[in-house]
C-alpha cells in the first residue's frame, strides 16, 4: 500500500477529535505516512535520532524518530542541518504518555532541500534586531511563525465579524487625489515625462492615507460597509508604533450615531480577542509563555469588561487632579485643548477606569474636518478607545452630515479643492452616519504582546532604508 500523504495539522486534528475506540481505525488508515517539511532541530546519540519537523500547516512540530538498526542512511540523516527541507516515509505511532500525542518512525527519507552550515537561524536565541535583518528567513523562527499565523487569523476574524453583521466589503483605491487626514504626509506618485507629477492623471496624486473618504459614499448606498487594506504615510516617526505602510480596517454605518459607532467598535474588538483566545490556542500559549506572561489575563479582562465612556473634558479634569495630587507625567502641563500623550491615555485607562474606556467629544481643532460638530460649537462627536498597557487602539466619529456645516468647516481648514465630490454626498440624500478606523498592525501587536510594529509586518516599511 502506498504511504498516505498527510499534513501534520490533519493528524493533530484527527487525534484530538477521536476517542480510544476509533484510534485503531485511524492508525490502520495512516499506518504508513508521507510527510514533508523543514527541520527545526536534529539530535542523535549514535543509535537513535530525533528530528522536530514543521510542515507549515500548523504551529506544532512533529517528532521524527530514526533508528540506526532500521534506517540504512542513518548517518546521512543525522547530519542533516537545521533548516533543511525533508521528505519522509514512516510509521505513525501514538505516544500518549509523551509531550506529543504521536511520532513518526522514519523508514525512508529524501533530502529535498539541503541547507548551508551558515544558515542564520540556528537553535539558539536571536534578538529581534537580528531577525529584522533577515526578514526573508524570520518566518521560520518560532516567534514569527506564530506572529504571521496570528496575522492571518486576525484578518479572517475581521472579515468574519463584518460579514456576519451584514457589512459589504468595499475595495477603495490605493492611488488618490486627496489627503483624507489633511496632514500632508503623503507619498507622491511620479511618472517619467515632462511633468512627472501631473502627466498621467492630470493632477498630483499620492498613495492613500485612508480609505475612509472613498468608502463613505458606499455607506450611503449599501448602509453598512467596510474597507480593509494598505495605507501609506510619509512620517519620519522612528517609534515602535509607526510605519510608513500599514493596514487599516475602516467601517462606515449609515443611520448611526456616535453611540452606535462605539457599540460596533466594542463588538468588533471583543470578537477578535475571542477568536485569538479560543481558536489560536498554540500560538497564544507561545506568546503568553515567551513574549508577555500577562497577555492572556489582559485579553480575558478586556473580553469580559464593560467599555466605559468618558468625555475628553472629564479626562482632562482627572489628569489635572492627578498632577495636583503629586503624580508626575513627562508632560505635566495639563490643559483643555491639549493633545493627550500615550502616558496620559494610559493613566486614564489603567489608573482611573482600570479597564477599556472610550474618550469622547474632543475639541474640534484636534480632529479631522469631517467629524460632526456638537451643539457646544467647541467639540466634535469623536471617540478614541483606550485600553490598558497600550493607550489608544481605535479612533472613530460620527461624520458631519449637515451640508452647510461641513462646507463651512472644509473652507475653514482649506481642504475644499478636490473634495467637491465628497461634499456632494451631503447634498444628495445624505444622512447621519458614523465610522471608525483600527490600525490592523497595532491590533496585532495588542493581541500578541509584540512590542514593535516592525515585528508584526512581513516586510516592514519605515523611514529606514529598504532592503527587501
Regions found by a protein language model. Give the residues of each.
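Secondary-structure capping and boundary motifs in well-ordered enzyme cores
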Residues: 78, 150, 179, 183, ...
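Metal-assisted phosphate- and nucleotidyl-transfer catalytic regions
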Residues: 180-186, 193-194, 267-387, 412-413, ...
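Short coil/turn segments at secondary-structure boundaries
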Residues: 120-122, 151, 168-175, 229-230, ...
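Generic, well-ordered alpha-helical scaffold segments in large soluble proteins
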Residues: 38, 80, 156-165, 210-213, ...
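Inter-helical turn/loop segments and adjacent helix faces that build the functional surface
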Residues: 255-259, 278-280
Amino acid at each position: 500500500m502506498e504511504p498516505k500523504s498527510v499534513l501534520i495539522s490533519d493528524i493533530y486534528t484527527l487525534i484530538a477529535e477521536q476517542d480510544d475506540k476509533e484510534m485503531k481505525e485511524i492508525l490502520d488508515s495512516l499506518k504508513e505516512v508521507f510527510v514533508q517539511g523543514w527541520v527545526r532541530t536534529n539530535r542523535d546519540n549514535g543509535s537513535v535520532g530525533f528530528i522536530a519537523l514543521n510542515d507549515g500547516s500548523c504551529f506544532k512540530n512533529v517528532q521524527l524518530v530514526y533508528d540506526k538498526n532500521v534506517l540504512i542512511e542513518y548517518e546521512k540523516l543525522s547530519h542533516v542541518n537545521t533548516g533543511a527541507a525533508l521528505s519522509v516515509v514512516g510509521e505513525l505511532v501514538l505516544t500518549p504518555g509523551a509531550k506529543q500525542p504521536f511520532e513518526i518512525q522514519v523508514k525512508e527519507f529524501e533530502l529535498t532541500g539541503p541547507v548551508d552550515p551558515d544558515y542564520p537561524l540556528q537553535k539558539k536565541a536571536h534578538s529581534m534586531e537580528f531577525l529584522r535583518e533577515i526578514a526573508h528567513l524570520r518566518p521560520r523562527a518560532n516567534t514569527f511563525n506564530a506572529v504571521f499565523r496570528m496575522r492571518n487569523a486576525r484578518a479572517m476574524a475581521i472579515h468574519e465579524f463584518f460579514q456576519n453583521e451584514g457589512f459589504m466589503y468595499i475595495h477603495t483605491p490605493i492611488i488618490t487625489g486627496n489627503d483624507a487626514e489633511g496632514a500632508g504626509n503623503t507619498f507622491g506618485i511620479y511618472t517619467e515625462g515632462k511633468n512627472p507629477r501631473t502627466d498621467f492623471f492630470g493632477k498630483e496624486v499620492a498613495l492613500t492615507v485612508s480609505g475612509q473618504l472613498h468608502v463613505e459614499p458606499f455607506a450611503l448606498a449599501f448602509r453598512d460597509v467596510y474597507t480593509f487594506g494598505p495605507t501609506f504615510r510619509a512620517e519620519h516617526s522612528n517609534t515602535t508604533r509607526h510605519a510608513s505602510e500599514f493596514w487599516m480596517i475602516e467601517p462606515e454605518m449609515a443611520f448611526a450615531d456616535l453611540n452606535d459607532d462605539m457599540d460596533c467598535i466594542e463588538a468588533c474588538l471583543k470578537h477578535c480577542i475571542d477568536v485569538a483566545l479560543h481558536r489560536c490556542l498554540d500560538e497564544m500559549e507561545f506568546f503568553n509563555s515567551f513574549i508577555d506572561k500577562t497577555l492572556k489575563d489582559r485579553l480575558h479582562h478586556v473580553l469580559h469588561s464593560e467599555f466605559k465612556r468618558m468625555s475628553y473634558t472629564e479626562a482632562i479634569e482627572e489628569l489635572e487632579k492627578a498632577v495636583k495630587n503629586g503624580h508626575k507625567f513627562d508632560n505635566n502641563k495639563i490643559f483643555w485643548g491639549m493633545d493627550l500623550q500615550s502616558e496620559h491615555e494610559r493613566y486614564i485607562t489603567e489608573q482611573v477606569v482600570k479597564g477599556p474606556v472610550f474618550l469622547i467629544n474632543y475639541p474640534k481643532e484636534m480632529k479631522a474636518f469631517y467629524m460632526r460638530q456638537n451643539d457646544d460649537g467647541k467639540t466634535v462627536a469623536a471617540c478614541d478607545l483606550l485600553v490598558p498597557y497600550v493607550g489608544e487602539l481605535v479612533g472613530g466619529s460620527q461624520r458631519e452630515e449637515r451640508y452647510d456645516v461641513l462646507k463651512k468647516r472644509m473652507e475653514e481648514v482649506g481642504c475644499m479643492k478636490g473634495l467637491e465630490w465628497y461634499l456632494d454626498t451631503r447634498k444628495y440624500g445624505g444622512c447621519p452616519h458614523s465610522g471608525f478606523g483600527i490600525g490592523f498592525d497595532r491590533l496585532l501587536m495588542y493581541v500578541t504582546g509584540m512590542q514593535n510594529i516592525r515585528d508584526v509586518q512581513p516586510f516592514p516599511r519605515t523611514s529606514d532604508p529598504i532592503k527587501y
